[in-house]
């Protein structure tokens, strides 16, 4: 499942997981989308085939990214557009307690090292005994810079030509 915006992505993920209980379902959500739709985590029919990654930067970072019109307002964008400091202001306890109290396995990461310590557990192909939430704490400056780097990557002409040939002739 997938889409754009905050309207029901977590609920859609849960519905898909109920329809196919033998498959593992992954969802990646920003904090605004997650908090908007988090009540579905308490659905009594949720199974152990759900994995949710929550990117918690404490605001709607897309409104602060270098390529969004809201970025022109700088810090004012946080207050009036990006909903900064909402839902516990990046609390390290709020989602942890909510998820654990509902029976989810809770994992967290605030650095690359911490992420590397938990990502294997989160992405295991094995069905686990509980659904999972992995909350990753980030900041909007790093996210915007990463987006800018990704959007401005250049591919060498040789690499493009090589890929075209592979597409036409197929892999070895």
Predicted regions span which residues?
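Thiamine diphosphate
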Residues: 1-172
